[in-house]
Amino acid sequence: MNKLPQETRVVIGMSGGVDSSVAALLLKEQGYDVIGIFMKNWDDTDANGVCTATEDYNDVIEVCNQIGIPYYAVNFEKQYWDKVFTYFLDEYRAGRTPNPDVMCNKEIKFKAFLEHAIALGADYVATGHYARVAYMDGEYKMLRGVDDNKDQTYFLNQLSQEQLSKTMFPLGELKKPQIREMATEAGLATAAKKDSTGICFIGERNFKDFLSNYLPAQPGVMQTLSGEVKGKHDGLMYYTIGQRHGLGIGGNGDPWFAVGKNLKENILYVDQGFHNELLYGDEVIATNVGWVSNKAKEKEFTCTAKFRYRQADNKVTVQIVDENTVRILCDEPIRAITPGQAVVFYDGDECLGGATIDEVYHSGKKLDYLG
């Protein structure tokens, strides 16, 4: 950074939560020219007619006034619908389990928002994500946040070199308790505000009820691979591979799990046992590849991977099939690898990039999760 902090404009995305509030506070204390932006991505009026976005924006206003920075609200509802929510529905329609947070970061927070910030004269954008950016060996590297429990690089795996070059993560070196403490000491209005969880556009609503508003449910048969009927399902879109709860299968013996889907015949396949081999894969084909790092210029390399958020790192070999596809060979079989979810690659603390899980194999045989 060649400019002095006071000459450097940073536009920060503020959600009305404690993380982005403290991120804004830190930037202001470091002397940057800070502007707070509240992104309205969804019309989220709840069942009681209360718009939670309005409440969140009021918290942003209060915090920005406390810190002493200007603020604006920007409406990205159309972009969010077109780029994130439509994708979300398409994936569920195809029987997969999508991760809208990854797409939101790629298309909204680090694209639409970044473009808007640059129009405001921003040198950088910032967010309250738990991640770090470092410039080393001629490229920008995205590193895990130091708080292992909160690290969010999994959701940021599609960011490009260009996006990272204009991004700051003020919370990357901090742990959550420190952030709460800073907010309390500064008297910020959001200091004790509960963290948001789940998918942002669903909020506190029932997932089945929400999804049925957009995709008509198609109940069908729940059966074993040998054809023994075990009950009925409410609609394939409501179940994910490895799911136990909500199947409603009683009886003695090991618990039952969802092990596959047949979209053509609308069948949910189930079987018993947490360690059932039908739930384990050792080879994955993943598409929609995005690379943060230049390491991917190699045709084959070893690294670790996460196949879902908060999962422990797994040793893998990545083979580049083409610019959009990779084959992943796992050192050990991994449970419940789920089509539609993100697989994210790491070299130590560095996030190399990620892709969308498409096909899963075990000992060379394709697991027909989406038969």
Curated annotation (Swiss-Prot):
Keywords: ATP-binding, Cytoplasm, Disulfide bond, Nucleotide-binding, RNA-binding, Transferase, tRNA processing, tRNA-binding. The record marks 129, 341 as: Interaction with tRNA. GO terms for cellular component: cytoplasm. One of its GO terms (biological process) is tRNA wobble position uridine thiolation. GO terms for molecular function: ATP binding; tRNA binding; tRNA-uridine 2-sulfurtransferase activity. It is found in: Cytoplasm. ATP binds at residues 13-20, 39, 128. The keyword Repeat does not apply. Signal peptide: none annotated. Its EC number is 2.8.1.13. Residues 99-101 are annotated as: Interaction with target base in tRNA. It catalyses: S-sulfanyl-L-cysteinyl-[protein] + uridine(34) in tRNA + AH2 + ATP = 2-thiouridine(34) in tRNA + L-cysteinyl-[protein] + A + AMP + diphosphate + H(+). The active site is at 104 (nucleophile), 200 (cysteine persulfide intermediate). Residues 150-152, 308-309 are annotated as: Interaction with tRNA. Disulfide bonds join 104-200. Catalyzes the 2-thiolation of uridine at the wobble position (U34) of tRNA, leading to the formation of s(2)U34. Belongs to the MnmA/TRMU family. This is tRNA-specific 2-thiouridylase MnmA.
